[in-house]
Amino acid sequence: LQGPKAQAILEKLTKASPSEVPRFGCVETEVDGINCLVSRTGYTGEDGFEIFCDAADAVNLWRELLKRGAELGIEPCGLGARDTLRLEAGLLLYGQDMDESVTPLECGLAWTVDFGSDRPFVGRVALERQLEAGSPRQLVGLKLLEPGVLRAHQRVQTAHGEGQVTSGTFSPTLEVAIGLARVPAPVVLGQNVTVQLRGREASARVVRPRFVRHGRALA
């Protein structure tokens, strides 16, 4: 249940106070009389909630959410819509924007590694070496400057070598094609690059890999 009206809709079905659930927090409560774990999390870049319940209760709960949320404009959506939202928000997809061959330093997730702790962990030595020497590649955002749609695996040509689009789509919010790409580290924000787009070359601009948050354009 995601979006600016998620809280108001959830309040219709539970005695708990959704506004008091902190971001990334959770609470055990009843939703429409069904025992649930409700977390203030999501994969859309919007405020919202994820509701966990027994599989046997899921269909009835889904239908009740749609029924009670109708007057507030609730709409069901699928993975395609969610993927567009997460890409607009710059949220990575494992197996596409990152995998076991990509370090956190190469995909904008260095903040998840606690280098300040003395605690050993698998890969620490290698990451510390990369941190000191500098990562040879980085994850950036792209905005296409001409008609077309960015898609995964398209080749990106920069002044410092080649890269590759990892995720791409058309952004309904920005009304332009956007994507995430892994490119050489020397590439900087604002530079133009060339993307191989279905047999032709198209220009794109390098931007921060976060395009939209809470419905507001960032790039």
Can you say where each PLM-predicted feature lies in the sequence?
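Conserved, structured C-terminal
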Residues: 1-219
